[in-house]
Structure formats: C-alpha cells, structure tokens
C-alpha cells in the first residue's frame, strides 16, 4: 500500500511523495497558487508603480499651483504698476493663496497695502519679512519709506542705513547709491542739512567718473549748503564735459553763494551761452554783475570810482526806502518811531554830505554813507521782503561786509 500523509490545510490524505494536496490545489485562486517570494515581488513592484504615479500626480498638482500663483502675481504686479492698487491687492492675495510663503509676493502685497492706505497691515508683513531676512534691501527700504510717511526721522534714517548695507540684486553699488540719495532728499525735506551733507560726502567719495552723476550730487550738496564739496564735483564734471551747461551753472552758483562774484559771473555767463533758457542762472549772473558794478570796496578801484559808486548806492537805497514805504502804506514824513520813517529822516539830513568830491577825499565819510545804505536796505528787506535787481546786490554787499568785519 502506497504511503500517505494527511494534508495540514484540508485534512485529506495525500500521497507521501506529492508536494501539493490535490484537494487544496483545486480550490486555490491565482494568487494563492503563487509561490511566496513571487507574490511578494509582485506586491513590491506594484507599490513602486503606485509611488511613482502618486509622486507624478502630486508634482503636477504643485506645478499647477505654482502656475496659478505666478499668473495671479503677474496680473497684480501689472495692476500695481498701473496705479490700480485695489485690484492689485486682490490679485496678489490670490497668488499667496497658492504660494503662501513666497517672500516676493508678500513684499508686493505690503506695497499694495501701503498704496491703499493700509499702512499698519503693510508694516506687519514687512517686519515679518525682515525677521526672516534682515539683510533684504527692498524690505528695509520699504520700512524706511513707511517711516518717511510718518516723518519719523530717526527710524527712517536707521532703516535707510540698513537698506544701504543690505544685499541687492543686480549692481549693488548702483542700488545703494540710489537708496542713499533717497535718504538725502528726505533729510533735505526735513531741514536736516548737516546730516544730508554728511551722507552726500559719502556718496561723492564713491562716485564713478560720470559727469551726470557728479552734477546731480553736486546740486544736492548745494541744497545742503556744502558749496566747496559741490564745486569740486562740478569741476570734475567739467573736466569730462567742458561745455556742459548744468555743471557750468552749478559751479557759478557755488561761487555766487560763497561771495566770489567775478568767477560766478564768468561761469554763469558760459552756462547761458550753452543754454539761454536757464532763467535762474540768468538772474544770478545779473545780480553778480550788479554787485561787481556797485561795490565801492573792491580793492583795485580808484578813489573817484569808489565815490561815484557810493553816491549811486545811496540814491538806490533811498529809492528802495520810498518804494517800500509806499507799498506798506507808511508815511515817511509823519512823526513815527518806526524804522523806515526814522531811517528816512536820518538819510534826508545826511543827503547834502553825499557828494562825490567829498566822498573821494574822505574814506570815513564813504564808510558812513555805505553803513546807512546797508541799514536802509536791511530795514526795507524786513518790511517788504527780499529785493531783486540792484537792491539785492546792495544787500549782498552788506552781508559780505558784515562777514568781513571782526
């Protein structure tokens, strides 16, 4: 009798030399008929395929999100550039819904918030961006501009300085110079001339040999009262472009403001030859010429010319006094303790002594005459405002003489 054994799965007797139970094999499906290692290998391959498909699907989904975010951002960016801040705000918020942590989108959203007057919300976004990236130049610049809106000078200066020393895309030197010049304009608008001058000196030290830039910074230095530093920049610009009207006019104004009227007249006249439409330069040149024609204290003048000028200046001052009194409705001959009637009475009494032959022989009389001229011009200026033409020239001579005295 052939040896048999009992199947451990179904309990039926099977031949001893049979590897499989004939009863079990009849009931098994495809998967149960596979060997264990074959089955596991198939499962592993299936898992890999599922992983690849899932990764592809997720990647495609994120790609679609990025595309939607970029589309919304581009639309919002264009709207903001066109001045449609409210539309831009909505579009950029949509972009952030698909790319929540994008720092560029957050920065542009802050700019849109500022444009719509929602400054505090913008500040929160900007401060969060700054906390994540303290060296971001654009973020620091936007914070500086917020401080400028609120006229918070120390805070604005701090953020401007942070922006200057931050990281910038493109040409960092150009970006930092632009930030510094923006700071300078804010300081000038805030009447912080000394601070503006200090910033401009730093800018001037790092300027490339570019006549336009040198002239631009020179013009700002003049506004800050740095005439000597401005003049150096204008002369550097003229080395490259000797006939460039803006640099010639700038140099002429520097000489004018420092009392060098002969050089001022020369440079301003050259500027006007290049560009006759420089009205401010023309007025300044004419005033410089008037100073040179009226000043009796110029060293190389002879005694007769000094006397002639002093007499002419006295007549001009009296005319200014009478015109100012008429403008203000003041009766110069009335008994009045006001400055204009008092000066008029003094000048009327003094007038018979203002003779050219007397002035040419008596330098002390000439000085006394000019002192009275200066007093009249200053009093008229206080009563009727800054003069023009010959009277402005006399006032400039007066200020120059006061500065020359110990």
Regions found by a protein language model. Give the residues of each.
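Register position in tetratricopeptide repeats
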Residues: 81-82, 115, 149-150, 185, ...
